Structures are given as structure tokens and as C-alpha cells.
Curated annotation (Swiss-Prot):
Part of the 50S ribosomal subunit. It comes from Thermosipho africanus (strain TCF52B). InterPro entries: KOW (IPR005824), Rib_uL2_dom2 (IPR014722), Ribosomal_uL24 (IPR003256), Ribosomal_uL24_CS (IPR005825), Ribosomal_uL24_KOW (IPR041988), Translation_prot_SH3-like_sf (IPR008991). One of its GO terms (molecular function) is rRNA binding. Belongs to the universal ribosomal protein uL24 family. PANTHER family: MITOCHONDRIAL RIBOSOMAL PROTEIN L24. NCBIfam families: rplX_bact. The lineage of its organism: Bacteria, Thermotogati, Thermotogota, Thermotogae, Thermotogales. One of its GO terms (biological process) is translation. One of two assembly initiator proteins, it binds directly to the 5'-end of the 23S rRNA, where it nucleates assembly of the 50S subunit. This is Large ribosomal subunit protein uL24. The gene is rplX. SUPFAM superfamilies: Translation proteins SH3-like domain (SSF50104). One of its GO terms (cellular component) is ribosome. CDD domains: KOW_RPL26.
Length: 106
């Protein structure tokens, strides 16, 4: 099945502690149906010193959130929208904005 939200998309969080925040999708985890969004759902982890990180301490990193809790922000109209699929004349399958009808994939 084609993914409605992909890496590099700008999304808005619909519910939870970060409701209303927007950010770029850094990683998509299809098996768990989750996405990692830059600057959203930031958690603190206690890191022990190791070979890669000489100094330990508390680090902040983004944690995955469910894909159903985010909505794609349309590049043309700038609104959080649902995504649909359609075929172009040449037969390629593209995503489009359900609010304004513009094609998202160029």
C-alpha cells in the first residue's frame, strides 16, 4: 500500500501534548505505522558514556508518534489536509490535497 505521509513532508500534529505544532517528517516506520517529526514529541534520555559519545548525560531526541495523529500540510494552500491518490494522464500515481485538489507530488 502506498504511504500517504512520506519522509520530507511537512505535517501538523492533530492531538496530544504537541497539538498544533508543525514539523518535517524525519523518518517513517511502516511496520508500526509511526512517523518521527522534527521538533515534536521530544523526550529526554539518560545516555551513558561510550565510544561514540565520550561524555554522557541527558540528551533530547524525537520519539515516534502514530501516523493517524498527524495531517499533511498542503504546499499550495498551506492547510492541514487529508491525502488522496489519483492517476495522471501518463499513468503515474500521485498524491493530491483533498481541500484544494492540487497535486502534492511533482
Amino acid at each position: 500500500m502506498a504511504r500517504k505521509i512520506r519522509k520530507g513532508d511537512t505535517v501538523m500534529v492533530l492531538s496530544g501534548k504537541d497539538k498544533g505544532k508543525t514539523g518535517e517528517v524525519v523518518r517513517v516506520i511502516p511496520k508500526e505505522d509511526k512517523v518521527v517529526v522534527r521538533g515534536v514529541n521530544v523526550v529526554k534520555r539518560h545516555q551513558r558514556p561510550n565510544a561514540q559519545m565520550r561524555q554522557g548525560g541527558i540528551i533530547e531526541k524525537e520519539s515516534p508518534i502514530y501516523a493517524c495523529k498527524v495531517a499533511l500540510v498542503c504546499p499550495s494552500c498551506g492547510k492541514a489536509t487529508r491525502v488522496g491518490f489519483r492517476f495522471l494522464e501518463d499513468g503515474t500515481k500521485v498524491r493530491y490535497c483533498k481541500k484544494c485538489g492540487e497535486v502534492i507530488d511533482k
